[in-house]
């Protein structure tokens, strides 16, 4: 395996720890709280790493080398019976609000405000679901209102950063903007699912969202 590919991942916890330490020195604090780095990965199966999310390794686990995930599991806690929804928005809405899809009722991916994204079916009626996503404030129809764990962390002194895909709420709703959820810095997160580029510093999507800059 190309060791160069592992190097940036290995640096992530180190960089975060260093930034926190520098901040503590500048402010004179002796903060013992841990840094929290949370990765949300789309379309990743439970056998897609060298770390088995089961009682034993499978053949597919042997196809990968993910030593940093193995190290995280040894040093932390691993859940072997924690399940995500089968599509992006429902999983992300569950993560940010701490509720499952049966409660927040975001059961498909979201994009345009007040627009369902379901395929039309002559035999089946589309159920009424929260196609505008989730929010921390009321006032938008077909939206689940919940408290963000990020907001709780921010209110308790954490510096919060979002980087990458967001997909919490439809366009022109409060929930589309990661800042709404308590993130002080947002890099590329917005209402659409994918990013146009991971290389630029602004204009990460086909639409010019002011909160991406």
Which residues does each predicted region cover?
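Bacterial Sec-dependent N-terminal signal peptides
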Residues: 1-31
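Active-site glycine-centered loops adjacent to acidic/histidine catalytic or metal-binding residues
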Residues: 165
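Short aromatic-enriched loop/helix-cap "lid" or pocket-rim segments at secondary-structure transitions
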Residues: 51, 94, 173-176, 198-201
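Conserved small/polar residues in nucleotide/adenosyl-binding loops
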Residues: 210-211
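Short active-site segment of divalent metal-dependent hydrolases/proteases
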Residues: 45, 168
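Loop/turn elements at helix/coil->beta-strand transitions in domains of secreted/extracellular proteins
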Residues: 33-36, 75-80, 156-160, 184
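Acidic, His- and aromatic-enriched active-site or binding-groove loops in soluble protein domains
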Residues: 102, 106-108, 178-195
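Active-site segment of extracytoplasmic enzymes that catalyze sulfate/phosphate-ester chemistry
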Residues: 38-39, 46-148, 152, 195
């Amino acid at each position: 395996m190309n060791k160069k590919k592992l190097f940036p991942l290995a640096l992530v916890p180190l960089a975060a720890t260093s930034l926190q330490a520098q901040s503590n020195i500048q402010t004179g604090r002796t903060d013992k709280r841990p840094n929290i780095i949370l990765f949300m990965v789309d379309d990743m199966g439970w056998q897609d790493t060298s770390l088995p999310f089961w009682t034993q390794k499978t053949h597919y686990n042997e196809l990968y080398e993910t030593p940093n995930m193995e190290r995280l599991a040894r040093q932390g806690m691993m859940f072997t019976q924690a399940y995500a929804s089968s599509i992006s928005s429902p999983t992300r809405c569950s993560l940010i609000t701490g509720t499952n899809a049966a409660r927040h009722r975001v059961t498909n991916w979201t994009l345009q405000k007040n627009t369902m994204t379901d395929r039309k079916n002559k035999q089946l009626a589309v159920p009424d679901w929260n196609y505008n996503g989730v929010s921390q404030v009321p006032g938008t129809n077909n939206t689940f209102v919940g408290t963000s764990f990020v907001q709780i962390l921010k209110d308790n002194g954490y510096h919060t950063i979002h980087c990458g895909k967001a997909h919490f709420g439809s366009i022109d709703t409060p929930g589309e903007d990661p800042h709404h959820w308590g993130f002080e810095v947002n890099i590329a997160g917005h209402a659409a699912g994918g990013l146009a580029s991971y290389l630029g510093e602004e204009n990460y999507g086909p639409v010019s969202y002011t909160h991406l800059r």
